[in-house]
């Protein structure tokens, strides 16, 4: 169901990580924002802190059941772990919502 969109997200993340990662290494920076809601289908923010990843998900209507949403979120974690070459236990997530 969401596999085609995951490929789009994967491609975007690879492109951004290549560019920003190279720039950060050159400048000796370990903490930076990698992704900030670039694609509307992925309302998340990804920040790198050395070997740790902080993922913020923006709460919004997504039209998915809770079960499908959990599968989607797990798939997002897998894509991030694959591209950054980290295990998923180094990815910390939070749901952000308006008060």
Question: Can you name each region flagged by the protein language model?
Answer:
Residues 57-67:
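A short interface-forming secondary-structure element
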Residues 52-55, 74-76:
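Short, low-complexity, polar/charged sequence segments that are solvent-exposed and flexible
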Residues 39-41, 66, 70:
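N-terminal, helix-rich and Lys/Arg-enriched segments in bacterial and organellar proteins
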Residues 5, 9, 68-76:
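Short amphipathic alpha-helical segments
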Residues 45-47, 71-99:
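Non-catalytic substrate-recognition/targeting regions of SAM-dependent transferases
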Residues 1-52, 58-60:
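Non-catalytic accessory regions of SAM-dependent methyltransferases
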């Amino acid at each position: 169901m969401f596999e085609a969109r995951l490929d789009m997200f994967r491609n975007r993340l690879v492109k951004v990580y290549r560019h920003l990662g190279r720039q950060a290494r050159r400048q000796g920076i370990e903490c930076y924002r990698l992704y900030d809601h670039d694609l509307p289908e992925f309302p998340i923010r990804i920040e790198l802190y050395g070997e740790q990843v902080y993922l913020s998900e923006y709460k919004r209507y997504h039209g998915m059941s809770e079960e499908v949403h959990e599968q989607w979120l797990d798939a997002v974690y897998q894509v991030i772990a694959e591209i950054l070459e980290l295990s998923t236990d180094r990815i910390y997530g939070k749901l952000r919502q308006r008060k």
